[in-house]
Amino acid sequence: MAFNVTILSIFPEMFPGFLNYSLAGKALEKKIWNLEVINIRSFAKDKHSTVDDVPYGGGAGMVMRSDVVGDAVDSMLSVHKNTKFIYMTPSGTKFNQNIARELLEFPHITILCGRFEGIDQRIIDAYTPYELSIGDYILSGGEPAAMVVLDACIRLLPGVVNNTDSITEESFNYGGGVLEYPQYTRPEQWKGYKVPEVLLSGNHKKISDWRQKQSHVITKKRRPELLSGEINDKFT
């Protein structure tokens, strides 16, 4: 069964963007995943296709209108009644590999991409989307964040990555969720740097032990919370 995605955006022309290339692009051609993009501006109430307005209470920036966004959401829900509805926002749960895997369990997902200062809170109150963030920084809109989420999901779909070991041995999958070990390829020596001898030994047990140790060392140094389990890694 294909992975089906609907995007709600005021810039539909941004999609599929970089998802039209490499693994994701080939998977889109093969219909391993399907993309539908809905233009929120199509639901605007005036001839200028206005989707935003000044915030009540004052403040900087503009806010996406609840009536316009709500009509776009209602239109989507009339077709995709069982979709998993997601809103990309910096204040959401931080996205990770486990969430990417769990998203694939849904037959259809919808991602709402915000702009300006975000969407009217009443959209969140009325539709209770799952609020998702890709990190502690601000983008100009939710579209790039949505593409990041989709890229992480798509490469996990059967038939996208030919060598499944590439997935099971990478960061956040390898060794119970730690960072990946260092990788080396030809030439054997470069600018005085040599490939570790153990990787040239042909001893698979020693190579495996070395990789596990390196993963643990790197994770402890850069992301110790992954070892302590102090992260929210569930899609709830």
Curated annotation (Swiss-Prot):
User: Which positions does UniProt annotate for S-adenosyl-L-methionine binding?
Assistant: G114, I134, G135, D136, Y137, I138, L139
The record's annotation in Pfam families points to: tRNA_m1G_MT
User: What keywords does the record list, in alphabetical order?
Assistant: Cytoplasm, Methyltransferase, S-adenosyl-L-methionine, Transferase, tRNA processing
Q: Which reaction does it catalyse?
A: guanosine(37) in tRNA + S-adenosyl-L-methionine = N(1)-methylguanosine(37) in tRNA + S-adenosyl-L-homocysteine + H(+)
A single GO cellular-component term from the record reads: cytosol
Q: Does this UniProt record's set of keywords contain Translocase?
A: no
- What are the disulfide bonds? none
Q: Name one GO biological process term.
A: tRNA N1-guanine methylation
EC number assigned by the record: 2.1.1.228
Q: Report the GO molecular function annotations.
A: tRNA (guanine(37)-N1)-methyltransferase activity
Q: Which SUPFAM superfamilies match?
A: alpha/beta knot (SSF75217)
What's the top EC group for this one?
transferase
Read off the NCBIfam families from this record: PRK00026.1 (NF000648), trmD (TIGR00088)
Assembly mode: Homodimer.
What HAMAP family does the entry give?
Answer: TrmD (MF_00605)
The family annotation for this protein states: Belongs to the RNA methyltransferase TrmD family.
Q: What is this protein called?
A: tRNA (guanine-N(1)-)-methyltransferase
This chain is encoded by the gene named trmD
